[in-house]
Amino acid sequence: MTVRILAVCGNGQGSSMIMRMKVDQFLTQSNIDHTVNSCAVGEYKSELSGADIIIASTHIAGEITVTGNKYVVGVRNMLSPADFGPKLLEVIKAHFPQDVK
């Protein structure tokens, strides 16, 4: 199984697209089976079926609600692997250990 990440920002045009690339690079280097997509906060509900983990800035993460086996990771610096990396790995290792190579 592949862990599915959704990067969310306010408009879905800038930050989330860059965050998608940064998260993809980080997870590839960490040997995690994954896919990463991005969208605006107003679109995340329509994208939830294709996501296991939502990653967003802390102020946007507070607006996101999920149920079931889905998780929200709020980060201060969406572009810094030093900030989002440990938080994302913690959720993946706890809930999606089969995706860690």
Swiss-Prot record:
**Domain remarks in the Swiss-Prot or TrEMBL record:** The PTS EIIB type-2 domain is phosphorylated by phospho-EIIA on a cysteinyl residue. Then, it transfers the phosphoryl group to the sugar substrate concomitantly with the sugar uptake processed by the PTS EIIC type-2 domain.
State its role. Answer: The phosphoenolpyruvate-dependent sugar phosphotransferase system (sugar PTS), a major carbohydrate active transport system, catalyzes the phosphorylation of incoming sugar substrates concomitantly with their translocation across the cell membrane. The enzyme II UlaABC PTS system is involved in ascorbate transport.
Major subcellular site: cytoplasm
The active site annotation covers: 9
Q: Quote a single Gene Ontology cellular component term.
A: cytoplasm
The induction annotation reads: Induced by L-ascorbate. Repressed by UlaR.
Say which species the protein is native to: Shigella sonnei (strain Ss046)
Gene Ontology terms, MF aspect = kinase activity; protein-N(PI)-phosphohistidine-sugar phosphotransferase activity
Q: What sort of enzyme, by top EC class, is this?
A: transferase
Q: Which domain of life is it from?
A: Bacteria
Start and end of every PTS EIIB type-2 domain? 3-96
Residues where Phosphocysteine occurs? 9
| EC number(s) from the headed UniProt entry | 2.7.1.194
Report any Pfam family annotated for this entry. Answer: PTS_IIB
Instruction: Specify whether Ion transport is a keyword of the entry.
Output: no
Protein name per UniProt? Ascorbate-specific PTS system EIIB component
Question: What is any one GO biological process for this UniProt entry?
Answer: phosphoenolpyruvate-dependent sugar phosphotransferase system
Keyword set for this entry? Cytoplasm, Kinase, Phosphoprotein, Phosphotransferase system, Transferase, Transport
Record localization: Cytoplasm
User: Can the keyword Nucleotidyltransferase be found in this entry's annotation?
Assistant: no
Catalysed reaction, written as an equation:
N(pros)-phospho-L-histidyl-[protein] + L-ascorbate(out) = L-ascorbate 6-phosphate(in) + L-histidyl-[protein]
| CDD domains registered for this protein in UniProt | PTS_IIB_ascorbate
